[in-house]
Amino acid sequence: MAQEDVGHLSDAGLALGLSLGGGGGGTTDAAAAHRGGCRRPSPSSQCPPLEPSLTLSLPDDAAAGAAATATATASGGGGPAHSVSSLSVGAAAAAAVKRERAEEADGERVSSTAAGRDDDDDGSTRKKLRLTKEQSALLEDRFREHSTLNPKQKVALAKQLNLRPRQVEVWFQNRRARTKLKQTEVDCEFLKRCCETLTEENRRLQRELQELRALKFAPPPPSSAAHQPSPAPPAPFYMQLPAATLTICPSCERVGGPASAAKVVAADGTKAGPGRTTTHHFFNPFTHSAAC
C-alpha cells in the first residue's frame, strides 16, 4: 500500500521539506537562526536536542493534503507509523486531484469529438427529396416515355424541375427498382396460380389412374353367372324392296303416235290391229329401254 501511494505521489510531483523539531514551524526557526548567525548556546539555556523531521507534500496543487500532513506530523511526534499514515493521506489527495483532472480532460475531449461529429453529420446528412405534384407528374410522364435518360436529357430535365442532375438520376433509379419489384410480384402471383392449377390437375389424374388400375385388376364375376341363359343373337337385317309397278315412260309417250301404233305390241302380248291404237306404253322401273 505504501509503495502504491509513493508511486502516485511520484507521478503527481512531490516537494520535500526539512525542519527541526516536532512541529511544522521548525523550518521557520532554522531560517531565523541562519539569518541571525550561528551562536553557541549558553550552558544556562541548554534545551533538549531537536530532532530533524522530513515533510513530504505536493508543491501547489494539493495544499489541503500538505496542511493535513503537517498537522499530523506536528501532533504525532514523527514516528515511523505516523510517517506512513502521512504518506497515505498525501497519496490519496494526489490521486483524487489527478482523477479530477483526468475526468475533466476526458469530458472536454468527448465534448469536442461530439461537436465535430455533429458538424460532420450536419454537413453530410442526405435529406429526403420532397417533390411537388407538378414535379412528380412531369417525372412520371418522362419515365413512361423513357425509363433511362442520357446525360443531356438528365441535365435538361433537372433544369426544368429546378433540381440537381444527381437527384433526377436517383429518382429514375428508384422508379426503375419499384417497377421491377412490382413486375416480379405480378409474375410470382401468376406462377403461383399456375402451380396450384397444375397441382390440382395432377391430383385428378392420379385419382383417375388409380380407378383404372382398380378396374383392370378387378376379380372375375362369380361362377353362377355362367348358368344364366345367353342372350338371343340379333335378328338378320333384311331390306324390303318396293313392289314392281308399271309406269308410263314419258319418252315413249312422246315418240309413240298413230303412225307407229301398228308396230307397238300391247302389254298382254297381242299385236294391235289396224283400227286399234295404243295410247300408253307401260314399263317396269327396273328395266330401262333404249328410248328412256
UniProtKB/Swiss-Prot annotation:
Q: Which PROSITE patterns match?
A: HOMEOBOX_1, HOMEOBOX_2
Q: Where is the composition biased (Low complexity)?
A: 28-74
Compositional bias of type Basic and acidic residues: which residue ranges?
A: 99-109
Principal location: nucleus
Q: Enumerate the UniProt keywords alphabetically.
A: DNA-binding, Homeobox, Nucleus, Transcription, Transcription regulation
Q: Where is the region Disordered?
A: 14-85, 99-133, 217-236
One Pfam family it belongs to: HALZ
* Localization per Swiss-Prot or TrEMBL: Nucleus
User: Can you supply one Gene Ontology CC term for this chain's record?
Assistant: nucleus
* Start-end of DNA-binding region: 124-183
Which Gene3D superfamilies does the UniProt entry name for this protein? Answer: Homeodomain-like
Using the UniProt annotation, give all residue ranges assigned to the region (Leucine-zipper): 182-226
Q: What induces it?
A: In leaves by drought stress.
Matching entries from SUPFAM superfamilies are given as: Homeodomain-like (SSF46689)
**Keyword set includes Cytoplasm:** no
Tissue distribution: Expressed in seedlings, roots, stems, leaf sheaths and blades and panicles.
Give the Gene Ontology MF terms in alphabetical order: DNA-binding transcription factor activity, RNA polymerase II-specific; sequence-specific DNA binding
Q: Which family does it belong to?
A: Belongs to the HD-ZIP homeobox family. Class II subfamily.
Record PANTHER family: HOMEOBOX-LEUCINE ZIPPER PROTEIN HAT14, HOMEOBOX-LEUCINE ZIPPER PROTEIN HAT9
Q: Write out the function statement from the record.
A: Probable transcription factor.
Q: What is this protein called?
A: Homeobox-leucine zipper protein HOX19
Organism, as annotated: Oryza sativa subsp. indica
Upper taxonomic lineage: Eukaryota, Viridiplantae, Streptophyta, Embryophyta, Tracheophyta
